[in-house]
Amino acid sequence: MQNLTFCGVGAHRQNGVSEQIIKDFTLSSRNLVFHAQRHWPEYITTMFWPFALVEAADRMNNLHVDMHGQTPEMKISKNIGSSTRLSHFHTFGCPVYILDARLQSVGGGGPPKWHPRDRLGIYLGHSPSHAGSVALVMNPKTGLVSPQFHLVFNDCSYG
């Protein structure tokens, strides 16, 4: 028979392993938000912390490799031969150019010849409900965050 013991209210120092993981996620997401704020101070606020936390967890689960060459995701799924597509990882808060919706539809006419064929967005991580190549993008004009597919990322040249 196993006995369960509970810690008291406010006694959060009972499990050092889980506290270290929470600290790592918090610091990583904090860094992601601050980095994005430096480049988009008028759009990125601390309200985007949940997006950064999910992105930090996704990176730790898919990119941290132990001495046996396995990521946490490989250990849980017991899938040793899988490989992470590094092309799906981008800088949190980087500029994203989204293809005009009129060009995405089949048989639709495009925008007039001298109008832009894309719009600017801000990358906030992978969409949890779609394929790995679908990103969550914030529209700076409206503030709407939506999943987007036809994208070009500008990872290195902003700032």
Where are these regions (language model features)?
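HHCC-type zinc-binding knuckle of retroelement integrases
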Residues: 1-143, 149, 155-156
